[in-house]
Amino acid sequence: MTGRGKGGKVLSLGGKGGKGAKRHRKVLRDNIQGITKPAIRRLARRGGVKRISGLIYEETRGVLKVFLENVIRDSVTYTEHARRKTVTAMDVVYALKRQGRTLYGFGG
């Protein structure tokens, strides 16, 4: 890695050992459905909820998606400002703090 500076990776375009162009593109499904009904039910139980309406599950997924989009957007902003390509735990901690949700136990 001498002489290339920071972040100077060499890209190979096929051949032995290198990855060529991908033949198939991965289909992005709606990953929010990965937050299952039992997972939402467990979170509600932890919060002291006894009975849950059937309409709650989709609403919870929507709210969680918006929340995570905001936190991830702020985290990536911190990462880009520091000229890094890896989002650190501290980026997420600072993003949460910016939104008024201070998180303890992850440094800082």
UniProtKB/Swiss-Prot annotation:
UniProt GO MF annotations: DNA binding; protein heterodimerization activity; structural constituent of chromatin
Main location: nucleus
Stored PROSITE patterns: HISTONE_H4
Keyword Transferase: no
SMART domains, A to Z: H4 (SM00417)
Keyword terms of this UniProt record: Chromosome, DNA-binding, Nucleosome core, Nucleus
Any single Pfam family the record assigns to this protein: CENP-T_C
Subcellular location: Nucleus; Chromosome
UniProt DNA-binding residue ranges: 17-21
Any one Gene Ontology cellular component term annotated for this protein: nucleus
Function: Core component of nucleosome. Nucleosomes wrap and compact DNA into chromatin, limiting DNA accessibility to the cellular machineries which require DNA as a template. Histones thereby play a central role in transcription regulation, DNA repair, DNA replication and chromosomal stability. DNA accessibility is regulated via a complex set of post-translational modifications of histones, also called histone code, and nucleosome remodeling.
Assembly, per entry: The nucleosome is a histone octamer containing two molecules each of H2A, H2B, H3 and H4 assembled in one H3-H4 heterotetramer and two H2A-H2B heterodimers. The octamer wraps approximately 147 bp of DNA.
Family from the record: Belongs to the histone H4 family.
PANTHER family membership: HISTONE H4
Name recorded for this polypeptide: Histone H4
Organism: Mastigamoeba balamuthi (Phreatamoeba balamuthi)
